[in-house]
Design a protein with these regions (language model features):
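A conserved hydrophobic position in a structured secondary element of the catalytic/binding core
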Residues: 127
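Cell wall/extracellular polymer interaction/catalysis modules
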Residues: 1-122, 130-148
Length: 148
C-alpha cells in the first residue's frame, strides 16, 4: 500500500543523526499503537493498542540510559511529549529505528503519526487520519514499513 505522507524537513538519509531533521531510509518493523483514549474509543487494528497518558514521553536525550525509549516525563531528561494538544500524536506508531540496542546520537523518536496539512516533520512519517485508519485495519504485529 502507498499513502501520501510528509517526511523530515531535510529529506531522507542513510546515515541518521539526532536532530538532523531527516527521515531514515530502510525497512523497519512497527511498534505498538499509542492512541488518545479521549478521542478514539474503539480502533479496528491487530496491533497492541496502548492508551496515551499525560506523563508519557519518548527519550531523545543522548546522555540518558533510556535514549530512544518510552519514558515517564521528567524535567531531568530531554524528551518528546507523547500527549499533545496539536493532534499529531492522537494515533502514533513508533517505527523501530535504532530501538533494539539504541546507538546514542543515531536518531530517536521516529514515528508514524498524523498530519492535517502535510507540513514536514523532524524525521517522522506523517499521514492523514483517514489513511491511518485504513492502515490500522490492514497492518499486523509483524508488518514493516519501507522508507525509500
Amino acid at each position: 500500500f502507498k499513502f501520501k505522507c510528509c517526511i523530515g524537513k531535510s529529506g531522507f538519509t542513510n546515515h541518521k543523526k539526532e536532530g538532523d531533521k531527516k527521515t531514515p531510509r530502510g525497512v523497519f518493523k512497527l511498534g505498538d499503537l499509542y492512541y488518545r483514549k479521549d478521542k478514539f474509543s474503539k480502533l479496528n487494528t491487530k496491533l497492541n493498542s496502548i492508551p496515551i497518558k499525560k506523563n508519557m514521553g519518548w527519550c531523545d536525550d543522548i546522555n540518558s540510559k533510556n535514549y530512544n525509549k518510552l519514558i515517564k516525563v521528567s524535567k531531568k531528561v530531554k524528551h518528546e511529549k507523547i500527549f499533545r494538544k496539536d493532534n499529531k500524536y492522537d494515533l502514533l506508531i513508533p517505527i523501530k529505528y535504532n530501538t533494539l540496542k539504541p546507538i546514542k546520537g543515531k536518531g530517536s523518536a521516529i514515528f508514524l503519526h498524523l498530519t492535517k496539512d502535510y507540513k514536514k516533520t523532524l524525521g517522522c512519517i506523517a499521514i492523514k487520519l483517514n489513511d491511518m485508519l485504513i492502515l490500522l485495519k490492514i497492518i499486523k504485529k509483524n508488518s514493516k514499513i519501507k522508507i525509500i
